[in-house]
UniProtKB/Swiss-Prot annotation:
<comment type="function">
    <text>Catalyzes the transfer of a methyl group from trimethylamine to the corrinoid cofactor of MttC.</text>
</comment>
<keyword id="KW-0489">Methyltransferase</keyword>
<dbReference type="InterPro" id="IPR038601">
    <property type="entry name" value="MttB-like_sf"/>
</dbReference>
<comment type="pathway">
    <text>One-carbon metabolism; methanogenesis from trimethylamine.</text>
</comment>
<dbReference type="GO" id="GO:0032259">
    <property type="term" value="P:methylation"/>
</dbReference>
<keyword id="KW-0669">Pyrrolysine</keyword>
<dbReference type="InterPro" id="IPR012740">
    <property type="entry name" value="MttB_Methanosar"/>
</dbReference>
<dbReference type="Pfam" id="PF06253">
    <property type="entry name" value="MTTB"/>
</dbReference>
<keyword id="KW-0484">Methanogenesis</keyword>
<comment type="similarity">
    <text>Belongs to the trimethylamine methyltransferase family.</text>
</comment>
<dbReference type="GO" id="GO:0043834">
    <property type="term" value="F:trimethylamine methyltransferase activity"/>
</dbReference>
<protein>
    <recommendedName>
        <fullName>Trimethylamine methyltransferase MttB</fullName>
        <ecNumber>2.1.1.250</ecNumber>
    </recommendedName>
</protein>
<keyword id="KW-0808">Transferase</keyword>
<dbReference type="InterPro" id="IPR010426">
    <property type="entry name" value="MTTB_MeTrfase"/>
</dbReference>
<dbReference type="GO" id="GO:0015948">
    <property type="term" value="P:methanogenesis"/>
</dbReference>
<comment type="subunit">
    <text>Can form a complex with MttC.</text>
</comment>
Amino acid sequence: MAKTNAVAGFNALNGVELNLFTNEELKAIHYATMEVLMNPGVQVSDPEARQIFKENGCEVDEETKVVKIPEYIVRKALQLAPSRFVLWGRDKKYNTVQECGGKVHWTCFGTGVKMCKYQDGKYVTVDSVEQDIADIAKLCDWAENIDYFSLPVSARDVAGQGAQDVHETFTPIVNTSKHYHHIDPVGENVEYYWDIVKAYYGGDEEEARKKPIFSMLLCPTSPLELSVNACQVIIKGARLGIPVNVLSMAMSGGSSPVYLAGTLVTHNAEVLSGIVLAQLTAPGSKVWYGSSTTTFDLKKGTAPVGSPELGLISAAVAKLAQFYGLPSFVAGSOSDAKIPDSQAGHEKTITTLLPALAGANTIYGAGMLELGMTFSMEQLVIDNDIISMVKKAMEGIPVSEETLSVESIQKVGIGNNFLALKQTRQLIDYPSSPMLIDRRMYGDWAASGSKDLAAVAHEKVVDVLKNHQVKPIDADILKDMQA
């Protein structure tokens, strides 16, 4: 792995690894995708994008707006796309490297429209507002296992007033010193986002390109469509040097085949079409191979995100991205629960663990509830603990002369214990040590107030919002960013 000054993330190159496919199976998915990209192809709604495809050798039908992308163009684009790029934070200690086969990172969920708030032991659900974005950004700035910040909810209090998405760009950058990933950008406003980023760098566009503190996500429309907005986010992002995340939200049984392998083919075609557009626009553009693909529950009429299928799909996507040499960004830490309860804990663990073991470069979903509609700050704090435990599981059991401990076993002998050994004292932090998960006996727990996990998490949220200090932005620079 290349050396970097980035410290965030967790190394997935050693320890436990999950492999879902043989190389032949990955090739089969690839070749099936190449067939789909030629027949039926992808509908591209944006005239500028169609022209870019046409000028680079793709077959374009202006009447149907269908673009057919030959395999040689896909292969060329994949050769141009970097396998590694750095996401900068305002504080460089939060820089993260997105690298195929590299570290696993976590970010919060986005983008919901409601907040689940804990009040006097009960939960209330309210519309999300701009202040919620600021508070969650501060909480993520504190959370050691959240490596960068994604737009978690919409600022619905400024909806309809114009420039809602610009508010949703400025507020996070000010309230966290970690990198900001905009999950709901508007193509026609990308230049406004760029003005904010450039202002942070004193108007130095070259520095802003070299050290991107901001990135964007767009979603193809399943099945097999690139909207005008998606195309414009890709094109403008590529031209400005902004990292772009092409993320499919296919639904198995709804907008993609009911078989998960078939869903991966649809998903793959959608993501690759966006990545090809980025590379044809500006060769070498920084891109993620993204996924929020899941199943469609034919009985409930919903798209569950706490299901084992979502975990499997996200793990599969991580392997597809590795097959193509691209960094991956996948859904995980997800739940269909309405409040931070046992259902949430179970679902979040399985949907976090599977893609983590597959080596996904970023797993997003922390703090999310209710199939992605709702965000909970208490749940984010709990998820921070869950992630730390998943990291411990990822380590596996290292076997070496030191860890086999033959000398220690012989020294202690029969019937004694290892507590007094220097090795034991030195490795006091070796076992997992979650912040909130309670491992005391019942009597000690009861004596401290008998608080359940959500209550303890709420206390931590209150403490962080009151006391955590985010690295400030110089007043003159802040004024320019607001201009």
